Each structure stands twice: as structure tokens, then as C-alpha cells.
């Protein structure tokens, strides 16, 4: 399992610890990842995703998983999230035709 957010693509970054004496040692900055279950209102199902705390805030801010995925760029999403986005778009298109 990679240390990357499935919705925003945030992943491990590398840098230095810098001491008071200005000694530098390499370190990793890990993203704050959480295993969460998010509900898709369009599909009527819940999905387990590994997302960063920042992405979770963004999902709530945009009004849910469906709205977040529709507005997000494909290159940031994981393969699972892209598949989910396509399913949501297909279901919304079917609902628009039926209405």
C-alpha cells in the first residue's frame, strides 16, 4: 500500500532535519493519511478510501464525495478513484436523460 492520498495525490516528501549547529540529516515528511469510508449518494454505496486529512476536509467542503470527484482533475486521482468518478458521471448522465 503506497503512502499517497487516493483523492489528492499527496505523497511522501523528502527533506532535512536541521539542528541548531546547522547539521543536516535526511528525513521523510509523511502525509497524514486516514482510512475512511465515504458514501456516494449517486451510486448509493459506501467506499473505503485512504485519504489525507486535508482531502477529507475538501470532500466535506465541496458537499460530499460525488461533488468532489466531479470537480477534481483526473491526474490527481488514483486509479480506483478515477473508476469511481466515471461510474458517478455515467449514473448522473442516465438520471439526466430520464428526467
Swiss-Prot record:
GO molecular function: structural constituent of ribosome
Record flagged with keyword Metal-binding: no
Keyword line: Ribonucleoprotein, Ribosomal protein
One GO CC annotation: cytosolic large ribosomal subunit
GO annotation, biological process: translation
Domain of life of the source: Bacteria
Family stated for the protein in its record: Belongs to the bacterial ribosomal protein bL28 family.
Protein name from the UniProt record: Large ribosomal subunit protein bL28
Species for this entry: Brucella anthropi (strain ATCC 49188 / DSM 6882 / CCUG 24695 / JCM 21032 / LMG 3331 / NBRC 15819 / NCTC 12168 / Alc 37)
Gene name tied to this protein: rpmB
Amino acid at each position: 500500500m503506497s503512502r499517497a492520498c487516493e483523492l489528492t495525490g499527496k505523497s511522501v516528501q523528502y527533506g532535512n532535519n536541521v539542528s541548531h549547529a546547522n547539521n543536516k540529516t535526511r528525513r521523510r515528511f509523511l502525509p497524514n493519511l486516514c482510512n475512511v469510508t465515504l458514501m456516494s449518494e449517486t451510486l448509493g454505496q459506501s467506499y473505503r478510501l485512504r485519504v489525507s486529512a486535508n482531502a477529507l476536509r475538501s470532500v466535506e467542503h465541496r458537499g460530499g464525495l460525488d461533488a468532489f470527484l466531479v470537480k477534481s482533475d483526473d491526474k490527481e486521482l488514483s486509479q480506483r478513484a478515477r473508476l469511481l468518478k466515471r461510474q458517478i458521471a455515467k449514473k448522473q448522465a442516465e438520471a439526466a436523460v430520464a428526467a
